[in-house]
Amino acid sequence: MEHKRIVEKSPEEYKTISRSVMLCLILAVVDQITKDAVVNAIPMYSKKTVIPGFFDLTYITNPGAAFGVMEGKGILLLTISMAVIVAMIIFFRKLCDGWCERYYALLLVVSGVLGNSYDRIFRSSYGKFCDGEVVDFLSFHIGDIPWAVWPSFNVADTAICVGVGLFILSNFIRPEPEKNDAEKKSA
């Protein structure tokens, strides 16, 4: 079966966009529901073992980005996040290049950015607007080996990583976009 690009502004493209936007919204809601469940069920810095020696639910917060980078820079992180979303919206069709999986990939990233941005805006323990911390709770490890612990993360982080990975993979396996006549002449 030959995989073809989706034609811009076609019913197929609108259907793909609708489905990927729906997935984006569902994941953003699931992210917040799971974070609320953890906040209400597990005391801060505590854990509930799900699979002994491998997987725990651990309630922690992260005042920065991935791995604690840019700690305490909530406004800057929000500004960067919103700039990324705006750029993705402006260049959405160009970035997708008609490949179905790229629509989903980009909107997975948007979903994760929205989920973590919500935390930065509304989950402030000090009552300051836009000074919140992201709730992380998924904790994987191998036994009690100190170097075999992955930093805790959440549904939004997962959506971002899967979206970025899918987009990169798509760029490796899909052909380059065809150049139009003007681009061919200048090359």
Mark where each language-model region is.
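Alpha-helical transmembrane bundles and membrane-interface segments of multipass inner-membrane proteins
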Residues: M1-A187
